[in-house]
Amino acid sequence: MPNVRDILLRKGREVISVPTSTTVQEAAHLMNQRSIGGVVVMETGRLVGIFTERDIMRRVVAEERDPASTPVGELMTRVVVTCTLDTSIEECGSIMTSRRIRHLPVMGPDGLCGVITSGDVLAFQVAEQQATIAQLNSYVFDVR
């Protein structure tokens, strides 16, 4: 059964992180620059939270906070749902759907080792389905 390790082999293990002292404005700029929807928040090499576009909308814009002076540590999601390298892709999809989240940090033996998104899960599933369709077409129609 395909697992998170398979996704990370395709996309890589780069993790974009910020410390709790980073301002919302700095985090938003980084997210925009890297074309990502969230950053993990780390302190002394430890995952302490996650900060996403949704947090910006709900906790900054909607509450009329100043992004230039508000640190992400005040607004980040502190209870972070994670997965492991061996978590099945199907289970990740279920977790993301039931928890209504789009980012899932991946924990390995030595701590944080990646982040997968709902888009990563969907892209992997689509690629697998396309491969299955190609195999079935080849079998049924003897296409080479």
Report each predicted region and the residues it spans:
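The conserved cystathionine-beta-synthase
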Residues: 17-35, 41, 82-100, 107
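Short, charge-rich amphipathic segments
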Residues: 22-33, 65-75, 110-111
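A glycine-centered beta-loop-beta connector
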Residues: 31-34, 39-55, 96, 104-119
